[in-house]
Amino acid sequence: MPRLFLHTLFPVAALGLLLTACTAQPPRPAAAAGSPEAAAAPASAVGRYPVANAGQLVVVTASGWDATEGELQRFERDGMSWHRIGVPEAVSLGRSGLAWGQGRHAMPQGDGPIKREGDGRSPAGVFDLPGAFGYGPTGHSLMPYEAMDASDWCIDVDTSPFYNRIIDARQEGEAAVAGSSEPMRLDLHNAGDDRYALGLKVAHNPANVPGLGSCIFMHLWRRPGETTAGCTAMSDSTMLTLLSWLDPQRHPVLVLLPEAEYARLRSAWNLPAVQVSR
């Protein structure tokens, strides 16, 4: 049976890795705001108040739509107020910047491209963080965790019935993973590559709509500033701090936005004030 990408519980394990590939197919033209692609997320996945039930926020802001670096900040809710936890931490983003993704938010009208498969952009918006994953048998978090095996793949082929899902080739057959560029054990498929040793799943494109982007993660980086294919990458220490803090009982969500969009939406979405250290 395939494991739904948005609800699979992933393993958080070994240190020192970074997830980089979130989509790796050739880029396609960006969809315009208001297009059918922009409206593809189901009603249950969007809303005017996308952080209403969240008790923890992982906020990533970037200088603009084409920025490839950003800052990660953590917040906890106390009643109607948000309180910052810790200090801002550097992260790397998609090689082409950001684009509106499909998540908990209603698709805003205004500037910004729409996320497409292979565009090299990290999805912007508000997204659930369903769980963690990694190479080791145990995690470093209260978050649901699943250890990945050599036969586990995230399918980024948008013509596949398993698009945007984690599947086990031993169960679904080798043909089911043909053409995918996302083995979840990169170390076993790419000469010891440890980038996926520790990470978090980002619930982007919950309806698994073909072409709107797949296999989005938060993960470790190999070196500061190294861009991704659409994920958010960070240092080992930042990931471990994040994982040790996250609590599934508090409904953690990721908010990823350019600074101007964050400022525009802050009041309407009840977002906390962020610190800009640049």
Regions found by a protein language model. Name each.
Residues 1-12:
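Bacterial N-terminal signal peptides that target proteins for export
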Residues 19-21:
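C-terminal motif of bacterial Sec signal peptides marking the signal peptidase cleavage site
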Residues 23-25:
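Bacterial signal peptide processing site
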Residues 29, 34-229, 237-278:
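Cell wall/extracellular polymer interaction/catalysis modules
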Residues 234:
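A conserved hydrophobic position in a structured secondary element of the catalytic/binding core
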